[in-house]
Amino acid sequence: MSDKTNDDKTLSVNPKKTLTLKRPGVEQSTVRQNFSHGRTKAVVVETKKRKFSRPDEKPEVEAAAAPKPAAPAAAPQQAPASAPVSASAAQASAPQPAPVKAPATKAPAAPSAPVTKPHVAQQRPVHQRPGGQQAQRPRPADRSGMVLNTLSRSEMDARRRALEEAQIREVEERARAVEEAKRRAEEDARRAKEREESARRQAEEEARLKAEAEARRKAEEEAAKRMPQPEARSERRDDARPAPYGARPQQAGRPQGGRPQPAGRPQQGSPRPAPIIADAAPIAGKPLPQSQLRKPGQSDDDDDRRSDAARRGVAAKPEVRAPKVVKGEDDRRRGKLTLTSNLEEEGRSRSLSAMRRRQEKFKRSQMQETREKISREVTIPETITLQELAQRMAERSVDIIKYLMKQGQMMKPGDVIDADTAQLIAEEFGHTVKRVAESDVEEGIFDVADNESAMVSRPPVVTIMGHVDHGKTSLLDAIRHANVVSGEAGGITQHIGAYQVVQNGQKITFIDTPGHAAFTAMRARGAQATDIAILVVAADDSVMPQTIESINHAKAAGVPIIVAINKIDKPAADPQKVRTALLQHEVFVESMGGEVLDVEVSAKNKINLDKLLDAVLLQAEMLDLKADPDRTAEGVVIEAQLDRGRGSVATVLIQKGTLHPGDILVAGSEWGRVRALVNDRGEHVKEAGPAMPVEILGLQGTPQAGDRFAVVANEAKAREIAEYRQRLARDKAVARQSGARGSLEQMMNQLQVSGTKEFPLVIKGDVQGSIEAITNALDKLGTDEVRARIVHSGAGGITESDVSLAEASNAAIIGFNVRANKQARDSAEQQGIEIRYYNIIYDLIDDVKAAMSGLLSPERRETFLGNAEILEVFNITKVGKVAGCRVTEGKVERGAGVRLIRDNVVIHEGKLKTLKRFKDEVAEVPSGQECGMAFENYDDIRAGDVIEAFRVEHVSRTL
């Protein structure tokens, strides 16, 4: 089928008509118009074509309208004529390239399908002239009005994309073909390997079956020899008969699993179907068919068949049982025979329960053997549990309990026994005993010997000591070029600060100690951990009590002293007075003929600081300070606190060895793994050598200031030492409380006699040293009547648990340089618990002293008024006995306290109820006058008794 288009306008020649020139764009055709009654008429129709085009497609010229579409069969005949006209028609009829100027010379039919417009061809079929005339052929001479059938850019792009996609698909198909070939080769290799494995397994199975058949044949021969001869003859006669009903030569309905039957099995006599079937199950390792199994209802039928054979005169065949074949290790675990299990390479493996039972059986057999007793050296502490003793002896705790039961003691593995009982048990079981004390766990941690060849010089540790406000911290600030005083509350140091400075390329470690009287323990710790002590004395204040105390601490620690006479810039400074005052305390400076170095400095104006540092280096050079940096670290805890963000933080001074992150150390009763090391400038360091102060993070708890620490080998050792020290601390606390209170009877008597009152407190501070100083200061405030009772103290902020404890013990909460969190504040407000914050120890001690003074009972003071002698005693109705007296000394006041003295013995003390002169009540009666007196609730008065009158005053006391 060809479409008629006007792409090429040519002249057409009709042999029946004259030669005419067709108008461009107009096509004439003749059609037959039908009328009624079969009449027709030829009508000339002119078709004028219009060309419509859109921006995204090429303009096309519509074909002439036709009354009916052309037949499909006419397309192949008209194709040669219309091939040059339409590219789409040419592509539809043959896979030849269209005569267009396109980059691709060839294109398959599928990619060019979107270019053709079949709906145009269907709507505009080729016009057929009447009488079988063909359409006019194009005239190449006339080109007027012609429209070239060129491809638009979008169609060219579509064809180009189709070609590229076809090429991509071709590459992908080629790659898939290569992969498929590779996979097919691997599959063939795998199948060949499987066939080889199957053949090998089949050969092994055949060999095994042959061996089993041979063993079975030998067993049958032995059984046949043991059977009597008549039965054998009857059996041979019976072999001629066919097999009984229900016996099948082979299992037709059961799969054989691909196992070949053993060929060439030796037979006795003629072939016997029944024995073959009976032997098939043991050979193949699977149960017999249901038809061959003896069921409960089949025994009578078998007996009937045997009786029928006997009646017919034929000897009954005796039942021959197959010999029992002992299964091997593989057959025991084979189980049911199936196709899956038969085709698999390996049989069923032993289960975990079977393996466990086998191991337990082996262990029991080993335990039944008599083993040689091993004698061990058992280390026994002061107390030990039965379980721990059994582990150390490598014995069962059950055996120890049985032994104790024989001795009449019922005990459990967790019970604790003493060292003597443990020694008896160990010796009874044949072990030797080594008795140790609990304190032995600490042996060796501080006794590590230094390697003399590895000793190197270390920086000196210098402690700055002196009286409060003599300028210790200011001097250290001037040396460090920092300002620490402004950070201390009240301008006084309440912590131990450790720093390092560099002078002439050499490091010096400084420890600043508080000078307040409450911080005696801190100064003592600072003196013990130092090499050199700098005694700071103000030139305008001379020697003070804490100065003397610092001198005593330094002498007790055996460290040399360097005197720094500070504040020489003041007008009232008198350094010579300081030197003279030091002579009274056996401190002889060089200017006075001694060996103690003294330097006049001014921390405020930074005068002579270099001389002071040079004196320190000179003294350190004389001491020849050395340490081994390669050994495990040891040192002392200078300060400890509980930081909210970092946990327990301990400021330590390394004295020996080098400390690294990850080391396990014990500090007092606490232990932990070092998570980080922070120097005095807040920088994280990888290691801390000798004489270096650092902060340690990672301890399980907050140690006490002054505790020694040491690095141990493992966590078990550290935990053991820490538990021992905690237990020791608890025992000391109990002993201290029991010593202070005594027995219950003594405590009750003391309360009744003295009436000691307690002021409960919960103290929370920023560092452990401050808490220790506060506790010691409050202990000194106590008297026989009142004392401060520290319910709880610790480093860290105030929490809800502290408030709950204070509420239970009716205590007040004191926070020193710490604050309570919001939950604790809300809880304290609800429960009415008072929380007081302090940052200066002076104010804290003064307030606690005032509060404790309020608990003191007021002082009772008596003032003598006068004496009166009883002259006569009168009995008055409704009043009682009234004494008629004369005032002999002083005066007597109404409502005053009186004592009745008889024979110089006080027999009554009370109050005066009435005082009358004649019949009038009077306030007082002076000396020399007579009066009448009556006592409250007392009538035993006699003539001649003396009445002593006095006034009682209650005066409040203070501590």
Curated annotation (Swiss-Prot):
Residue numbers spanned by region G2: 491-495
SUPFAM superfamilies from the entry? Initiation factor IF2/eIF5b, domain 3 (SSF52156), P-loop containing nucleoside triphosphate hydrolases (SSF52540), Translation proteins (SSF50447)
* Record GO terms (molecular function): GTP binding; GTPase activity; guanosine tetraphosphate binding; translation initiation factor activity
- Annotated region G1: the residues are 466-473
- Chain spans, region G4: 566-569
Tell me the ranges covered by the tr-type G domain, including all copies.
Answer: 457-626
Give its localization: Cytoplasm
Ranges where the record places region G3: 512-515
| Region described as G5 | 602-604
Gene Ontology, cellular component aspect = cytosol
- Biased composition, Low complexity: where in the chain? 63-118, 128-138, 246-284
Q: Where is the composition biased (Polar residues)?
A: 27-37
Q: Which InterPro entries match?
A: EF-G-like_DII, EFTu-like_2, IF2_assoc_dom_bac, IF2_II, IF2_N, P-loop_NTPase, Small_GTP-bd, T_Tr_GTP-bd_dom
Alphabetical list of PANTHER family matching this protein? TR-TYPE G DOMAIN-CONTAINING PROTEIN, TRANSLATION INITIATION FACTOR IF-2-RELATED
Family membership noted in the UniProt record: Belongs to the TRAFAC class translation factor GTPase superfamily. Classic translation factor GTPase family. IF-2 subfamily.
Give a short account of what the protein does: One of the essential components for the initiation of protein synthesis. Protects formylmethionyl-tRNA from spontaneous hydrolysis and promotes its binding to the 30S ribosomal subunits. Also involved in the hydrolysis of GTP during the formation of the 70S ribosomal complex.
- What's the name of the protein? Translation initiation factor IF-2
* Organism, as annotated: Brucella suis biovar 1 (strain 1330)
